[in-house]
Amino acid sequence: MGKRRVDEESDSDIDVSSTDSETELESTQQQQQQQEGATTIQETVDVDFDFFDLNPQIDFHATKNFLRQLFGDDNGEFNLSEIADLILRENSVGTSIKTEGMESDPFAILSVINLTNNLNVAVIKQLIEYILNKTKSKTEFNIILKKLLTNQNDTTRDRKFKTGLIISERFINMPVEVIPPMYKMLLQEMEKAEDAHENYEFDYFLIISRVYQLVDPVEREDEDHEKESNRKKKNKNKKKKLANNEPKPIEMDYFHLEDQILESNTQFKGIFEYNNENKQETDSRRVFTEYGIDPKLSLILIDKDNLAKSVIEMEQQFPPP
């Protein structure tokens, strides 16, 4: 697979050197302003993003960390090492983004696991059970997932439809503009694999992702049992007061902006609570706002044609700088 590089602008040409002739106050102030501006410019970091094939010898621990991040509060329910092995096994498709060469840790990964061919693998069984339990409240979504992901009367290889699990995760400060080329390369690799009669002839793709709800800061509960009952009474009183006021609109946002495009091209999607949601951490997850961040699980099922359509829309909406 070829590499693609995104080059950013080089160092600034602004000259901020002082001169002995600048003795007047106005000149000194101008010089200080230039120096402050130069400091800001120098703090801008230029980074080259290089695209690499996934490497089992190098990317295993980073992939586990990305999986831990992707599964949120429920990451402890799965054997992440086994999932990482499935992602990185020989001849797998997918891409990583690195900045310091092939042997450095990735800043982002995108790959796919063949769920249909791995229905009997323990960790995949566990993952499917988890997903089916989550989608019980969405009947149509749940029914199609059961048809695609459970062993009924047919054998794995005789199934009419095959499903892939897309694993897409990155550092939170990675620009979304790196994602369209990663998806495009994934589609190209799977197309070549189809020609070689490999295991990537998918009809559907399941995407596990994350969103978050912005919530008012919550007061941490005191662990002292003597104060617990008093706190519960206070909370009940607060709820009664809030009930008399107009309800605040629920604010949701995306960790992965490309998920909005994927969701717009499918009817099978949903946002769900984590099993192990830690309410006490909501307030500590505040970033740059007065609100806390309450993460949620996002599940998207999209067919092959609509995934290809989504990638084109990603390229249009998130073009390279």
From Swiss-Prot:
Source organism phylogeny: Eukaryota, Fungi, Dikarya, Ascomycota, Saccharomycotina
InterPro entries linked to this entry: BCP1_family
Family affiliation: Belongs to the BCP1 family.
Function of the molecule: Involved in nuclear export, actin cytoskeleton organization and vesicular transport.
Biased composition (Basic residues): 230-242
Protein name: Protein BCP1
A Gene Ontology term for the protein's cellular component: cytoplasm
Span list, region Disordered: 1-39, 220-245
GO biological process, one term: protein transport
Pfam (any one): BCCIP
The entry's keywords: Cytoplasm, Nucleus, Protein transport, Transport
Native source species: Candida albicans (strain SC5314 / ATCC MYA-2876)
